[in-house]
């Protein structure tokens, strides 16, 4: 890269996820918010507030313990930290749940769960008695408001759903999206992914493989508060070394670079950041723009700074990632690359396709094309978004709010104190008809939790004003330090201008052209409305198409967030409940079951294996057995965490090898917990003999008391949709052949109480639909939900300086 700095002043410009440094610019009349290059100051907390906080924590934990005792639902921890999750984090997350009944637009229809049933609402069979209402959405990441269909774009999406296959998409369409998105981003090549998380995995893999081909040692240097997916992407590349530098500290970054270059001059150093830092000589620059793509200027942080007179050309970025859910309003992500990384990214993209990796759905790809071909529309949205976000920041700053985010950022972030304060703020906002997001430990300091207010370009000015006044009123009620009672009236709202008719004209013309393109593709790639898509016949296929059109009309293409604090779609809960009751044999063995959905099966499998490799309980050695034929996600997940003495990972080629290794272990450790990853179907179509596998393992245990626990992970990616009388997978087949009690019978009375059975799989492999799932006991799914939180994943995977 060029040694020229991207700044035209002597100021260092640092852009990250939530805390952006913005120097004063000539001619600016507005005050600059978040301008100090410093870590956020934690508000002072009195001894009385600390005591009240700990009393509140203890109360929540005791209530949860009483609930467990009353219902006789005994909690089984997956790992050591799960106790805090079960007795505290999960209960406070359930205090104010909301279920989304519509797309996550600026206004959203929700179903509110009464406080009398919030702790058990996931067990309710019928939500119809819970009241519905519309609220202002300031909690989702749909900043550009692109979840709403502009002009005639809804017709384009419906045509795509009817005429083209849902997934996998036509090859020609995928190629066109990669080419046009690369051109839009000013890069040489591009690859789409099923999530922003998987985009960062691909980006780091591309950088590491490039370094390996150059014969150089790859070193990743990350901001200490980078997104969890960045740390995960770095750590799964075991031949690379990962280091951190202080958050938003350019001086520490330059110091670390000098030290690394002095120690290893030939190293391939990759600086990976969220936003923009000053370029440094001979250093690779990787940018992740989860919250900036199609938000800041339309092409992320770089274009945002370019508009302010700074020299930061997109072409000088080596690798960039983006998240579509926070920009286009669709699930997915992308990676773009320049220079020598372009060829490696193209190679990785080809390998993923050859290995049958999940792909974005056809409608998402069409939506990407639709938006990036509307430059006037995007520019108008970006201008509107910045005006509204700046207005909110100005008003809150005037009222004394300590804004931590940058001026003009669509995420307005400020500290509110303890977790109790954050929870109360969330509750008070909901009561007043507003949804906001909260940041709590471990993502924030204990005494400085955050409220994150998300601004949409499509939020009306009236709702913007009401949102500001609500924040101030609630802050005063909660006695948040520094905020004074202030009421802003409509007369301060900025002047509004009529829409430019050329924007709609360009939009309609672009979508009409794309609609013709979709119709031409359907002649070669007919969709479910035109021919049957196995395992469905033609009438069923057409029924599925009509259901998808109705789903788009109700929910849009955009995703929702995790249930706790943010809210999730009612249809997601319905699917989870259907999955939880899918296998009577699993319920017969585990009791009450739950299911969990994932954006993509690869990331879900990675997180599942990562969680299962952590210490089980004190004094027990956790042994994980993995066949060498397991997928890359399984291997990466098992090796993600730092090595521990209490955990061992053993790979085997055949079951005989596993038995031999287990025989050695049984004499070396006094207490064992075994985790077996098993594929229910092999590549040749043969079915797993679970009974023989379990009996073979048990026969090698000289002392039955030595085995403290057994976890069976049944990967049904090759079974769901293919085997069983209902095509519901491995357990469906076993239930027909052996009855619903077969799990208990094969495990026996002594082993069954010690055994956790986890069923996981891929909707993509089964039905061509994006996503993965986990089905197990209610306690396992609960703790795994907590274990999958982004910050926890990053903490678990720490192993480098």
Where are these regions (language model features)?
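PLP-dependent enzyme catalytic core of the Aspartate aminotransferase-like
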Residues: 2-7, 148-150, 179, 183, ...
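Short, glycine/polar-rich helix-capping loops at beta-to-alpha or helix-loop-helix junctions
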Residues: 224-233, 447, 628-643
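Active-site C-terminal subdomain of aminotransferase-like
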Residues: 297-407, 414, 420-421, 711, ...
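N-terminal "arm"/small-domain region of PLP-dependent enzymes with the aminotransferase-like
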Residues: 2-165, 495-557
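Active-site phosphate-binding strand-loop segment of PLP-dependent enzymes
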Residues: 141-142, 243-293, 532-533, 645-713
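Conserved PLP-binding catalytic core of the aspartate aminotransferase-like
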Residues: 79-80, 87-90, 99, 381-393, ...
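Conserved PLP-anchoring active-site segment centered on the Schiff-base-forming lysine
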Residues: 206-228, 596-598, 608-632
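Conserved N-terminal alpha-helix of the aminotransferase class I/II PLP-enzyme fold
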Residues: 104, 113, 154-195, 545-598
């Amino acid at each position: 890269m060029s040694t020229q700095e991207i700044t035209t002043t002597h100021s260092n410009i640092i852009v990250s996820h939530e805390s952006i440094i913005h120097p004063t610019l000539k001619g600016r009349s507005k005050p600059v918010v978040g301008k100090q290059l410093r870590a956020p100051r934690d508000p002072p907390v009195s001894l009385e507030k600390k005591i009240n906080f700990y009393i509140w924590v203890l109360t929540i934990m005791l209530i949860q313990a009483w609930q467990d005792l009353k219902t006789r639902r005994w909690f089984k921890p997956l790992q050591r930290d799960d106790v805090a999750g079960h007795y505290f984090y999960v209960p406070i997350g359930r205090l104010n749940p909301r279920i989304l009944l519509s797309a996550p637009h600026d206004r959203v229809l929700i179903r509110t769960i009464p406080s009398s049933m919030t702790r058990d609402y996931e067990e309710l069979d019928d939500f119809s008695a819970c009241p519905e209402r519309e609220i202002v959405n300031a909690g989702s990441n749909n900043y550009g408001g692109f979840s709403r269909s502009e002009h005639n774009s809804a017709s384009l999406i419906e045509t795509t759903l009817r005429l083209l296959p849902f997934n996998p998409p036509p090859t020609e369409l995928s190629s066109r999206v990669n080419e046009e998105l690369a051109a839009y981003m000013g890069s040489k090549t591009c690859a789409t992914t099923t999530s922003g998380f998987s985009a960062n995995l691909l980006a780091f893999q591309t950088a590491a493989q490039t370094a390996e081909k150059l014969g150089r040692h790859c070193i990743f240097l990350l901001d200490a508060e980078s997104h969890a997916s960045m740390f995960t992407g770095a750590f799964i590349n075991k031949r690379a070394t990962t280091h951190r530098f202080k958050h938003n500290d350019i001086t520490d970054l330059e110091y670390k670079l000098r030290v690394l270059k002095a120690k290893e001059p030939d190293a391939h150093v990759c600086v990976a950041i969220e936003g923009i830092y000053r370029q440094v000589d001979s250093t690779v620059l990787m940018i992740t723009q989860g919250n900036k793509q199609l938000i800041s200027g339309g092409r992320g942080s770089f274009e945002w700074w370019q508009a302010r007179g700074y020299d930061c050309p997109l072409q000088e970025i080596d690798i960039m990632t983006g998240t579509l859910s926070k920009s286009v309003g669709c699930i997915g992500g992308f990676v773009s690359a320049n220079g020598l990384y372009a060829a490696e990214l193209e190679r990785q993209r080809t390998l993923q396709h050859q290995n049958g990796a999940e792909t974005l759905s056809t409608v998402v790809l069409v939506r990407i094309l639709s938006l990036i071909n509307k430059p006037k529309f995007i520019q108008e949205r970006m201008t509107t978004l910045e005006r509204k976000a700046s207005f909110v920041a100005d008003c809150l700053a005037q009222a004394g709010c300590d804004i931590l985010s940058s001026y003009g950022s669509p995420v307005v972030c400020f500290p509110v104190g303890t977790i109790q304060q954050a929870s109360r703020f969330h509750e008070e906002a909901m009561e007043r008809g507003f949804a906001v997001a909260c940041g709590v430990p471990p993502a924030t300091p204990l005494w400085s939790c955050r409220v994150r207010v998300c601004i949409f370009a499509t939020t009306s000015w009236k709702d913007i004003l009401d949102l500001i006044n609500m924040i101030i009123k609630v802050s005063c009620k909660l006695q948040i330090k520094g905020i004074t009672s202030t009421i802003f009236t409509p007369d301060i709202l900025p002047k509004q201008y009529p829409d430019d008719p050329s924007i709609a004209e360009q939009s309609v013309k672009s979508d009409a052209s794309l609609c013709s393109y979709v119709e031409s593709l359907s002649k070669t790639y007919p969709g479910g409305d035109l021919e049957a898509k196995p395992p469905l016949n033609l009438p069923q296929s057409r029924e599925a198409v009509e259901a998808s059109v109705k789903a788009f009309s109700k929910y849009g293409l955009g995703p929702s967030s995790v249930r706790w604090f943010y809210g999730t779609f009612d249809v997601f809960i319905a699917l989870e409940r259907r999955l939880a009751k899918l296998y009577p044999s699993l319920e017969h063995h585990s009791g009450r079951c739950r299911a969990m959905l994932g954006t993509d099966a690869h990331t879900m499998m990675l997180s599942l294996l990562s969680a299962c490799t952590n210490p089980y309980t004190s004094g027990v050695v956790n042994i994980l057995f993995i066949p060498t034929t397991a997928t890359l996600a399984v291997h990466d997940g098992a090796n993600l965490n730092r090595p521990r003495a209490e955990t061992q990972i053993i790979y085997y080629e055949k079951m005989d090898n596993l038995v031999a290794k287990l025989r050695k272990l049984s004499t070396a450790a006094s207490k064992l917990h075994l985790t077996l990853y098993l594929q229910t179907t092999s590549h040749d179509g043969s079915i797993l003999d679970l009974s023989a596998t379990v009996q073979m393992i048990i026969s090698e245990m000289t002392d039955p008391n030595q085995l403290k626990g057994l976890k069976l992970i049944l990967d049904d990616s090759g079974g769901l949709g293919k085997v069983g009388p209902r095509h519901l997978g491995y357990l469906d087949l076993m239930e027909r052949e052996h009855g619903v009690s077969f799990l208990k019978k094969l495990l026996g009375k002594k082993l069954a109480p010690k055994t956790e059975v986890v069923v996981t799989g891929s909707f993509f492999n089964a039905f061509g639909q994006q996503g993965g799932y986990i089905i197990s006991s209610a306690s396992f799914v609960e703790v795994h939900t907590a274990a999958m939180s982004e910050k926890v994943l990053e903490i678990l995977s720490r192993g480098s300086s």
